[in-house]
């Protein structure tokens, strides 16, 4: 199943290559005025603009202006220069860009951007919206998932012309690199698309459509001026799509926030815009984390010292590379998720008889007796993520804690947070998902955000903050020990119910990433202090994270006591 569509993708690439070759044959056979000779005899942009006008007039004949004649793209707020439809062919393909940027193309092809539309995880969900409310409502999604189809006027029940080739490519090079300006950071496609141009002429006027590679390499400065804007390197650029809301137009209820990664980043220490964070971090943007420099394994003219700016946009999506067999992308995604994003601290033990707190574990001497009833306090710190855990679509992305008590033979005596044989998570597990409810209080499990009226739970961890999870267990009465307690945080795209909805229930198990783990040994009798492990936080920080978690639980007296311990250890903090 994982590689089922690879053949189709290869066929598609071959067809695109043939189209590209045909275009250049036309240029060399007498229409070269558009491609060579300084482009003096006819400006290619004039032809593109004329074609656009004719195309738009034809598309307007059957287009459904459900939200008003002057608002063709609502509920998305994406706009395009000229305020009318544009033919899909006006966007040079990613294969065209591949000619000079093979490494970037290779990375992009495996990215979520390149697969933003075609995956069943997306199409099955948006299909519910189209069938229940109408195709026009899916424009809410397509401003970010399939902009070429949105701006070409094909997100309508009966388009006058149909060209769905770009469905396979999602967000292409010339989608991102044709955005001319940003609207206020509302998300939901808060950008203004330009008519794609890969080069400027001598007067600084955009040359629409494809030009010869010889022209580009002869005038690289004019190519860069056409396809790069300073704001492409800002968080606000990413916020245009990585922030969203549910307008009343979509839900027939009221405006609701959907995702807010940009807002969460602003509240983090990485942004340097908020007084609220507890820890100081170096300034980092979306691009710092998700577009680091990466070794260029293929030819690419933008290579510097063997690297290019990554066009993988590695984050948490393991499902797309697993589905399409992109092993390299999957490997890097799993490595990214495990790269010190979280800290799991088995911070304390509490006896259920109320005889006191043993904290922080590892720094105090304490006794354990057979039959003791204990509570482990697990503190989970979001230490390396610039937004929440879970980010974005919190209702179907799944992160949770797993806890185990094992004996000396490895036998599991107590467990929480396991997956059953069918891939479903223990319903009693501590999960970081958000549960969405419709107007009647029904749980929404297929990401039907247009039916959402309220949120039942939201257990996500804000950037730089912590949460506290408690686990009760009993030491066996006849046990001799030693015993081991282990806590870890797991993550997967997507929860089993949503994966089954998208793929059916015959799919292989989808990857689960172990983001952080910590174990401690409990002996019968005396347990002495032990040396900290390299991944452990300093003692003052362990108390601080415990206090932060208590503060967020509104346990103010207990939080104050924890922070008092911090000031004893760090008077300068």
What are these regions (language model features)?
Residues 45-88, 104-137, 153-463, 469-538, ...:
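Primarily the internal scaffold of c-type cytochrome electron-transfer domains
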